[in-house]
Amino acid sequence: MIKFQSLNQSKQFLRIFKKKSLNTKYFTIYFEKNLSSVKKNDKKFLNISFVMKKNIGNAVIRNKIKRKLKSAVQKVLKEKQSVDLNYTYVIFGRNNVYKDKFQLIFDEVNDMFKRIKQIAS
């Protein structure tokens, strides 16, 4: 099983924000190729962070949006395997995620990771 590893330093976020990005109705995803793959004890990690602006609802709404996006990425990892583990991702959630159904969000996340794979190759 692939585990998520979050970015934890502001300079890591700033470096990724200067790289490529893709926009959708539900989120903006920034991505950058890793210099080395992260493996600990033969476990694979995906470098990904979910970020929200403070002007979107209250903390409960922001956390629900992050949970929906995170579960959509987990489902893509399990079913489709279209996520490239050699990249670092930062996903900015938008307010539309809170209102819409999970299947729409899942389809959008899956399409975004396919587009990133096409851009990478």
What are these regions (language model features)?
Residues 1-121:
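Positively charged, solvent-exposed patches that mediate nucleic-acid binding
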